[in-house]
């Protein structure tokens, strides 16, 4: 019987599953390409830091994980994307250990009125100091 060491793994929070889950070099049939699998939480880390320009601390908080775990996820994601771009591999996005963040706060989920899940009553997140 195997026992897991350390703390139990908690699901990472993501804003939503991506609409597009496969990217490949143009002009080459997918069957001929190697693929690199990018998990949903790896894509979320790239989205928060590289696309939305959030500091690592804020991005880690948004995903509900420590900065160290966040950094490891981000480093893995960047390596996989770089490998796929440089070596002409297909990027397959899927899987991972995640949970979709509740859509109650516009500042957290950043969907607001454009929510693809049809939620139209997002509220602004109130800080403790307010």
Curated annotation (Swiss-Prot):
InterPro entries: UPF0251 (IPR002852). Signal peptide: none annotated. It holds the Pfam family DUF134. Belongs to the UPF0251 family. This is UPF0251 protein MmarC5_0986.
């Amino acid at each position: 019987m195997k026992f897991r060491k350390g703390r139990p793994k908690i699901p990472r929070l993501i804003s939503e599953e991506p609409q597009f889950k496969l990217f490949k070099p143009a002009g080459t049939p997918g069957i001929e390409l190697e693929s690199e699998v990018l998990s949903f939480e790896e894509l979320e880390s790239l989205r928060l830091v590289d696309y939305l320009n959030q500091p690592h601390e804020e991005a880690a908080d948004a995903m509900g994980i420590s900065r160290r775990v966040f950094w490891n996820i981000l480093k893995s994601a960047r390596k996989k994307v770089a490998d796929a771009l440089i070596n002409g591999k297909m990027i397959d996005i899927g899987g991972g250990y995640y949970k979709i963040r509740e859509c109650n706060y516009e500042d957290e989920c950043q969907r607001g009125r454009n929510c693809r899940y049809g939620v139209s009553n997002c509220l602004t997140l109130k800080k403790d100091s307010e």
